[in-house]
A protein has these predicted regions:
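Bacterial Sec-dependent N-terminal signal peptides
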Residues: 1-12
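Surface-exposed acidic loop/strand-edge motifs in secreted or periplasmic proteins
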Residues: 10-96
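A broad, low-amplitude sensor of folded, mature protein cores
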Residues: 1-2, 34-37, 70-75, 110, ...
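Extracytoplasmic electrostatic interaction patches
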Residues: 80-144
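Charged/polar, solvent-exposed surface patches and flexible loops
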Residues: 9, 33, 125-129
Length: 144
């Protein structure tokens, strides 16, 4: 089962790290910018692909679109973070198979953005074929 953290706690854990080295501080700033900053990105929803920027490093999608991700014509080589939107409470019962992301060579982070209240454990239970190369974190916004 993956270790799922609230996004701010995840970034804080990077900042505190084992020691406050320049590497851990700059890494936490990089991740913070990756999560909250505007980056070249791909939006993949309902089979439609929209790419913004030359070398996208961020992919936005939703639970319903995940099944089509492997066959979609996406620029996968430089994606470092995938933002998955949870729109309804029924989405929380969906499974996210991390094997679908195996073609994303630089992928390190999976960010769950939920419109419904949920827990770290509920999000962790959504994942299949967990691989420790991915850090998984979440945020709840505009919860019903």
């Amino acid at each position: 089962t993956p270790n799922v953290m609230y996004v701010n706690a995840f970034i804080s854990s990077l900042k505190s790290g084992n020691a406050k080295t320049r590497v851990s501080v700059s890494n936490s700033q990089y991740v913070e910018n990756l999560v909250f900053g505007i980056q070249p990105a791909i939006y993949f929803n309902s089979g439609t692909v929209k790419t913004y920027g030359d070398i996208p490093i961020k992919l936005f999608t939703d639970i319903a679109s995940l099944n089509g991700i492997s066959s979609a014509n996406l620029l996968k080589d430089d994606i470092e973070i995938i933002v998955i939107k949870i729109k309804s409470s029924t989405d929380l019962y969906s499974k996210i198979d991390l094997l679908k992301f195996s073609e994303f060579n630089k992928l390190k982070y999976i960010y769950i953005l939920s419109n419904v209240s949920t827990t770290e454990q509920n999000i962790a239970n959504m994942f299949l074929n967990y691989n420790q190369q991915y850090s998984i974190f979440y945020k709840i916004e505009n919860a019903e």
